[in-house]
UniProtKB/Swiss-Prot annotation:
SUPFAM superfamilies: Cyclin-like. One of its GO terms (biological process) is G1/S transition of mitotic cell cycle. It holds the Pfam family Cyclin_C. Belongs to the cyclin family. Cyclin F subfamily. The keyword Disulfide bond does not apply. This is Putative cyclin-F1-2. GO terms for molecular function: cyclin-dependent protein serine/threonine kinase regulator activity. Keywords: Cell cycle, Cell division, Cyclin. One of its GO terms (cellular component) is nucleus.
Amino acid sequence: MFGPYSGGGGVPLPQMDADTYVRTIAAMPPHPLAPPPDSPRTPHTYVGFLPVFGDLPPLTGAVLQEPVPVPPEQRADQPVAVATENSAPTRPQLCAPYDDEVEATLRAMETNPAERPSPYFLETTQGGRMSALVRASMIAFMGEFSRKNKLADGTLQRAAYFLDRYLSVTPESDDALQLRLVGATAVFLAAKYEDQYTLRKIDASMVAARCGYTSETRHKMVSIMETEMLAALGFNLGGPTAYTFVEHFTRYYGDGEEEKQLKEAAHRVADGTLLTYGFHRYLPSMVAASSIFLARLHELGHEPWSNDLAELTGYKAIDLMGCVCDIYSQIACPRFALLQGKNKRVCKSTSMQGMNMMA
């Protein structure tokens, strides 16, 4: 854990300590012994896309005999499912292998040291030349740049991921123009990764102009920085972010208004963590699960966690305590514009403070 962000304003909320946290998760109503048929682990959205083949009768010459209808409970060729009190919810057999492969791949990638930022890159690689507030101002600039150009969802999360990895291996100067170039290039690179049609919205020349470059060859500055960043990242761009895991954990959500609000709120919580130096030390899946926890607590007012969510995410409520408490400690800061609107992920106070330091 780490202390509250020191650069924000506002009156801090009381810390959510272990006792408060445990009381919160224990205040849930008891869970039923058997999961409902529309469990989050049941990929009902896949059913319409999977071919269903009935029992084909044998062919004798050119004669096709009609099968005799048999009640479902008397079908001898169907396995009998025996439900017990301890039965775990299961996915349809046709979907399970694919779903499990995706899960295993994401978990392996997020724990790969080669694709993770250094835990203390500001203190080590940057040698104290860059403060947590300057980094936060870079994220604020990147968020504004991403929103103004209406870049793909998930771009800011991936751009921040690229930035932290780049700063983990590349010492940077404190030149404001250079810092803007680094941040904007990270957004440009992330946007192209997330959406193949990004170049229809922005190009290298527009990116350079947004940073403050005015020469006719300004696009070359972005191209050079992009090459340097790709080399620093080892050309490994596909690591999962908290956005990836929020999408993964809510993949069975329907089109209901409540589910949409929960998903959007979880994304806003996860985006808010980008501004605070230190959250990169948590695994993206834990940040995503903690964001869903707080979004449910805010939207539903009760039952922030359940057995189905524990199975889906791989985290019990008690496992999330540290991350949830760290996020909760930031909510009082004005710069952590939590759950206040779809596009209000970065507050103006942090942006203005950071821009003054970068100017």
